[in-house]
């Protein structure tokens, strides 16, 4: 198929390890466009990149213009501005909502979202709640969403896999908290990529949710033992009840070098069983699922970065000179976001009577004026 005749597919989160693995496969059928916060040239399956900050609705609208299909791989685990107020769940909602609004405006036919497995007992950590919330927000503006829910993705550059691999490499004797007895169903990166490729542009999978996982279910301790075998390391695992989640976060960060902001929500999720529900998707796609041991060996053999992208602590000069501030509030019954905003702009100049005035412009919205200085 000639490049000009290929449908245009937009990938948000193109620089992540899943996005990098996806593009070469999808490029066989699509004109693949990656979204990036900074300007960059196409390559490795991406026909082009578009500069886009998903915290800006206007940026999102420009970036999705002309697209037919979209894949959403964004997860705001680490700060991306000079000053960030709000946690990862708040930031994720803003980006997902902007993306969904822009997709609806651009006439996108389908959004494919890579989310997280949900425990069968219904209990969710904040991290897993955020994944479900993003799934809901993406579907909130009329574009059909196909969701693949996965647990730990076994890929060389994946942050979760790198954390586990570094623990095994650096600790000959591993003192294991209770959560290491929790059952999990990880999945090979290659399987995830194949299944995403399969569901894109298939109407039968619009507005559907699929759990994906390896053929077997193991505990986290067994998963670390598999990693030790793949690395050729002899390791001893000692179960303890002493390590609290807080202590676990601290020692994992110290041993692996992973930022605590990344480790904390992941550790919170480890007490929940991450087991895939029944799904015929792999069979339908003709995919023979990769065993966890094989997936781990492939991940270790892969040419992954010395320092994973998610582990890098940005220097102050690397972050945009921006403030990202997101606060949530519970609206009283009968209120809307607009009525709350209007009440705020009426209250603020009364509270700061001699300091601040609020001007309303029908085209531009509201502006705030510091009275003593005349600064808008």
Predicted feature residues:
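SDR active-site strand-loop-helix element
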Residues: 12, 35, 73-74, 111-117, ...
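Conserved glycine-rich Rossmann-like NAD(P)H-binding loop of the short-chain dehydrogenase/reductase
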Residues: 31-37
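NAD(P)H-binding glycine-rich loop region in Rossmannoid oxidoreductase-like domains
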Residues: 40-106, 117-121
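A short helix->loop->beta-strand "cap" motif at the edges of active sites that frequently abuts
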Residues: 105-110, 143
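Residues forming the Rossmann-fold NAD(P)(H) cofactor-binding site
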Residues: 19-20, 93, 132
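Oxidoreductase cofactor-interface core, primarily capturing Rossmann-like NAD(P)-dependent enzymes
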Residues: 121-233, 250, 257
